[in-house]
Amino acid sequence: MRYLIISLFLLINSTFAFADGHLTKDQKAQTIECAGIYYANSMIPQAELELDKIVHSFAAKKFLSSYLIKEGVNEDNLNKELIKVVDVRYGKPYEEKTTNECDSFIFELIPNSKNEIEKLIKSGIY
């Protein structure tokens, strides 16, 4: 009986932990990659990319950075990883397909992320 209670407790506890939205290692890595892609996109000159895409990238990068820190990613490590992605992508043209794939991944992974990014865009604080 005791083992049954302990097993039920562990099962319920792990279900709640998963429901809180904690990311797996692979999900964190992909989210950091997408944040880096948005970061690199935000550095593309306005003459080469529409302003709305630059603003979206700024807002998405800000949202994801905050989200990842809340998920327990160390801010210094996050910044180092973002710089690695930017170093690879800086100076390259905007990739619509890659950015859309990141949008789809993030919007599916993080509940209400699309609305939160839209709020940042509308607020002008990004």
What kind of feature is each model-predicted range?
Residues 7, 22-23, 90:
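Generic detector of short alpha-helix boundary/capping microenvironments
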Residues 3-15:
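Sec-dependent N-terminal signal peptides
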Residues 17-19:
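Boundary at the C-terminal end of the N-terminal hydrophobic targeting segment
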Residues 13, 38-39, 106:
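Generic short alpha-helical hydrophobic face used as a protein-protein interaction/packing hotspot
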Residues 23-73:
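Short N-proximal segments of mature Sec-exported proteins
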Residues 52-126:
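Compact alpha-helical subdomains of small soluble proteins
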